[in-house]
Amino acid sequence: MSFSFGFSGDDIEVDGQATEHEALTNKISECALSDSRESPQNTVEPKRHSLEELLASLPSRVSYGTLRIPSFSEYGKLRDINSNDPGAVTSVYRRSVFDIRAQLMAEANPSAEEEEEDTARTLLSGLESGDLSSGIYEGGFKTWECALDLASLVITEKDVSGYGQGQENEDDDDGPEAWEVVELGAGSALPTLALMQKFIDRRRERPTTHGGSLKVTLCDYNADVLRLATAPNVFLNYLFASSGRVSHPLDDRGNPADGDLDLEELGGEALVSRTIQDMTADDISFEFISGGWGPAFLDLVYPPSPPSPQASLGETDHQHPPKPTNLLILASETVYSPSSIKAFTETVLGILASHYRRFTAAPVIGRPSPPPRAWVAAKRVYFGVGGGVDEFVREVERLGGRSRVLVDVQDAGVGRVVLEVTLSPAFMDSAANT
């Protein structure tokens, strides 16, 4: 399926920061150009984080904005964001930028010397001036056009919901499909949040026992982006979508509006714990990974398989195969820097290959998983720095993958696309035998 559509900057920055967004877009090019001329820096060691850990520093009151994401009509056009037709628009909640800024100001060390490292101060500088620091802050608190492109595609595609095509029959012995989602360079994680909303909407249509499962891994180089933006966004969206205990304000059209959430009034830590327990009961789980891409990162996404308990009894893994899952990798604005395209491409194909070995090439319980895939949204070219779609596609093909255009974005600015990346037949044969 191929769509052609466009977004303006005003569709993105609901905090009244469209001008700042444009300036930060220019900073991406400057940062990538500087990064490509310098020798590679030591990357941060990848680390896994839990939702509980990341929400521990959440303040007692959280301000949030609401973003309405349109789906596509059958003719490939974006629906009206004010449409009341079922499924036409999905509302996604995100923590307000000014709320993140307020927390960073509270955490910054005012007595630190200029040369001393103060992460909060560095991140605050990035928010206030639009400065990007390679390997420290690369715009993760902002919402970019490509993330919206990807979110619209997610809510439009009928087979991305927690239910597989042809598996919606409650009498099906194999049951509904299990989904795994990995978002790289997640930032505000809008595409994943849109997918979770879609999953929960489908859950309401069927008994819980037939609701499928959703396992999400959200990844960002910066652990503070995960802590201050990504995890709070997950919490807000699940809380509003699934809980009858918490309501949100509505605008004059009856749509969700911006607001404030008083966590202390609603139970504080007990509310957070109860919400995470509800996620588990709904077969929804979230994990988070910070740090740089590479072999260690891949091991956190898909840990090496330990010997099975049955092996010591003389049984083989073929006698105890895993239950299949569908894998979808999501990524947006991750190919702007020529110095990181190779590592990013290796990471995408590495995750696809790991999943293929475990759930597609190997024996599984029930139906085999379909081939894993990745959806990568990017600008066609990042002027002046060499990054962009063409270089990424060349790297995908060089490493044994293949790609095709799913979405072609046409507007007054730089062209944007969403690519689907899969393993080539030769790559799949190689992966199955390793």
Task: Locate each region found by the language model.
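S-adenosylmethionine-dependent methyltransferases
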Residues: 1-434
